[in-house]
Amino acid sequence: MGKPIVAIVGRPNVGKSTLFNKLAGKRISIVQDTPGVTRDRVYAEAEWLNYNFTMIDTGGIEPTNDDIIMKQMRRQANIAIETADVIVFIVDGKEGLTAADQEVANMLRKSKKPVVLVVNKIDSLKYEENSWEFYNLGIGDPITISASQALGLGDMLDKVVEHFDRFDADAEDDEYIRIAMIGKPNVGKSSLINKLLGEERLIVSDVAGTTRDAIDSYLETEQGKFILIDTAGLRRKSKVKEEIERYSVIRTYASIEKADVCILMIDAQDGVTEQDEKIIGYAHELNKAIMVLVNKWDLVEKDDKTMEKFKKDLQGSLKFMPYAEYLFISALTGQRTHKILELAKKCYNNYNKRVSTGILNDVISQAILMKEPPIVSLKRMKIYYATQVATKPPKFVFFVNDASASHFSYERYLENQLRNSFDFKGTGIQIEYRQRKE
């Protein structure tokens, strides 16, 4: 299961972006932040009190017309309800309670999702009593903050992480392999999911999320137990294309975060697009197991070398993830679709693989004998031993004399040795150097 997702929701100009940027400004321990598909930063990886979580800013465009504001607020609330594990609902302590706040609070209350009510712009104690009227929203005790001055953020985050125990305890689905089918619209994701569900007779259930758009399908096959995570985009039309794109990014990111295996589906006639690269880039950065499905292969004119050439071109476009598995299919005709779950299971097994310390160090010792680390800044890194410290993805720690003497080319060499020895096809692996005195 991925990290808990925390979504920030609120009216325009209440301080959503200020709060998000303050939290992403390394005033709490931000592990990593990555730009989204749009120019706006959509999410950031964060840590508080040893809890790792993902923040999502539902912000987007800030309208001025009251009717448009209300429509946008509903969309924000829906996307937060659909994707988040905890919702931070931010209101304006200086402006006071509004009808828009009331309506969104009603939506959040009905969703049964944990909500942390935050009253912003309480810049001094004299404004503290401004928070009292927000008790009327009926979604718990308001927490007062000043996002711009970073006041009260610790109390807010304490309240947020209180809800994570419930999230961590919900492990009933741990025996299932979570698969996110990702890709641009109209590439055939829905057709493929329907085919997989239609061909498998042991479907356990279809569990609908909090909105009609979020449906995860549970199925059992000879290969194992799987959850197919729906990554459908917004189906309603909107004049504001940028806003729709932002919500689509949030949906896709949330699906990837929750997945073990991410399957990028591309159109054989289009090849890899910039949008494809950005979408699968999320999965790569989050170190998920990755497969690439080339759909509509039945429509391509080909000879016995076409597939090999096509795959080579794809690997050139996606060279940042050379470990990915590839499969050429037709969701329409069913060509090779029976191999998808089998390959997904293989990727998952490698993603979850553990190597014994003894065998690992035999491989590393042999690798060092064949090629010793280079000299960097007049120093040569000495590797004492290595151990695997995690799975999903496999993470290896190398204890060395001087971590600053490491070189990326040698790290790549070590990674290749690990891959050749232990078959980590379909998953990223992580390498970390830790300094140890001789």
Swiss-Prot record:
**One biological process term in Gene Ontology:** ribosome biogenesis
Q: Which GO terms describe its molecular function?
A: GTP binding; ribosome binding
Q: Which Gene3D superfamilies does this chain map to?
A: 3.30.300.20, P-loop containing nucleotide triphosphate hydrolases (3.40.50.300)
The domain of life is Bacteria
Binding-site positions, GTP 2? 183-190, 230-234, 295-298
Q: Which Pfam families match?
A: KH_dom-like, MMR_HSR1
Query: Where does the sequence pass through the membrane?
Result: none
Q: Does the keyword Phosphoprotein apply?
A: no
Could you list this entry's UniProt keywords, alphabetically sorted.
GTP-binding, Nucleotide-binding, Repeat, Ribosome biogenesis
Query: Which SUPFAM superfamilies does this entry report, sorted A to Z?
Result: P-loop containing nucleoside triphosphate hydrolases
The answer to whether UniProt assigns keyword Nucleus to this entry is no
Positions of the KH-like domain: 353-437
Task: Locate the residues binding GTP 1.
Answer: 10-17, 57-61, 120-123
Domain named EngA-type G is located at 4-168, 177-352
Residues folding into a coiled coil are none
Q: InterPro entries, alphabetically?
A: G_ENGA, GTP-bd, GTPase_Der, KH_dom-like, KH_dom-like_a/b, P-loop_NTPase, Small_GTP-bd
Assembly description? Associates with the 50S ribosomal subunit.
What protein family is recorded?
Belongs to the TRAFAC class TrmE-Era-EngA-EngB-Septin-like GTPase superfamily. EngA (Der) GTPase family.
Q: What does this protein do?
A: GTPase that plays an essential role in the late steps of ribosome biogenesis.
Q: What is this protein called?
A: GTPase Der
